């Protein structure tokens, strides 16, 4: 049951990414605040129904990020919702919860269900401009599994990982101790650059938004990543500010005044 809840959580955290990716700009370049629950694009300001590129929104969140900005150490759902816009895994869920290849271009699973092979997508960039390598992927998976560390997995689901091998510069083989039909969903876990020593201070991923700044108890700011690999699904927004508003009454007031868009 615990593993099933984990899988559902991995699929649900994509919801905010969908909202940010499909927001419609209003007249002032900000998102329309009249609909705070749906990612469906409004056609009122744009008769063709096509999303408008650019602009910014401010999203109200009930509390500051209380755990790590390191995606392998964060546990709170609110943190994951934000980090899911910064980081990507070998696969990622779409708006319907289907797992699609992301940093990986394709994948296959052995007949015994114990070996997962991924072909990496060519030219995927981290936010610092470096290119994702097989070594980065190997490092990320081994880090989650506690391999080459103190043996303690950073991500519990990866305790089943036996080893990770690189047959060639664009291929990764992940060997499991036991077959696990839910393991593919765990591979939404963030691929991070091996050369970044402190992801808490420098959150570097491959997602459609890159981290800009954080003011504790005030806000977290993300901006569009112009070199995002998925050219057909670029972020529409240029900037997203997550503003901490703990009082639910204040949220309503700010939405009405336009201080918050969502």
Question: What are these regions, as identified by a protein language model?
Answer:
Residues 19-22:
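C-terminal motif of bacterial Sec signal peptides marking the signal peptidase cleavage site
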Residues 24-26:
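Bacterial signal peptide processing site
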Residues 53-63, 115-118, 137-140, 172-174, ...:
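Short, well-ordered beta-strand elements
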Residues 60-109, 142, 204:
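N-terminal lobe/hinge region of extracytoplasmic solute-binding protein
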Residues 95, 182-241, 247-250:
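Gly/Pro-rich hinge or "lid" segments in bacterial periplasmic/extracellular proteins
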Residues 105-150, 256:
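Aromatic- and charge-enriched surface segment that lines or borders ligand/interaction sites
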Residues 137, 170-172, 251, 256-262:
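Alpha-to-beta junction loops
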Residues 153-195:
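Surface-exposed binding/hinge segments that line
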